[in-house]
């Protein structure tokens, strides 16, 4: 669960955009090369388990968080009804039985 403010902070997917005027993946603007595998060529998007940008641990259950910039794992964020990135209350879970199974 992510709040509206933190949705802007989420990363973009490696797949190209659908074609439209002004898209960032068109060849005319020089933004995207043809026959390029972005998963192999982009060094900053590649996962480095021992590097500086390691994933943090959840503040509640201490498990590893698989989203850069998040402080809570998705299971704990769902159970508590909070944003996974900032911890802001998103959903009132008073009358719910929240399970992550």
Curated annotation (Swiss-Prot):
- Residue runs in coiled coils: none
- Region of interest (PDZ3-binding), ranges: 98-101
According to its UniProt record, where is this protein located? Cytoplasm; Synapse; Cell projection, Dendritic spine
Q: Which domain of life is it from?
A: Eukaryota
**Entry keywords, A to Z:** Cell projection, Cytoplasm, Disease variant, Dwarfism, Ectodermal dysplasia, Hypotrichosis, mRNA processing, mRNA splicing, Spliceosome, Synapse
- Transmembrane portions of the chain: none
What are the start and end residues of every segment in region (Sufficient for interaction with DLG4)? 95-101
Pfam families listed in its UniProt record:
Cript
Major site of localization recorded for this protein: cytoplasm
GO annotation, biological process: cytoplasmic microtubule organization; mRNA processing; protein localization to microtubule; regulation of postsynaptic density assembly; regulation of postsynaptic density protein 95 clustering; RNA splicing
Q: Name one GO cellular component term.
A: cytoplasm
Question: Which family is this sequence assigned to?
Answer: Belongs to the CRIPT family.
Its quaternary structure?
Component of the minor spliceosome. Within this complex, interacts with RNF113A, as well as with SF3B1/SF3b155, SF3B2/SF3b145 and PHF5A/SF3b14b. Interacts with TUBB1. Interacts strongly with the PDZ3 domain of members of the DLG4 family. Associates with microtubules. Interacts with DLG4.
Q: What is the disorder linked to it? A: Rothmund-Thomson syndrome 3: A form of Rothmund-Thomson syndrome, a disorder characterized by sparse hair, eyebrows and eyelashes, juvenile cataracts, and poikiloderma, a genodermatosis presenting with mottled pigmentation, telangiectasia and epidermal atrophy. Additional features are short stature, dysplastic nails, and skeletal and dental abnormalities. RTS3 is an autosomal recessive form. RTS3 patients also exhibit microcephaly, with moderate to severe neurodevelopmental delay and seizures.
What name appears for this protein in its UniProt entry?
Cysteine-rich PDZ-binding protein
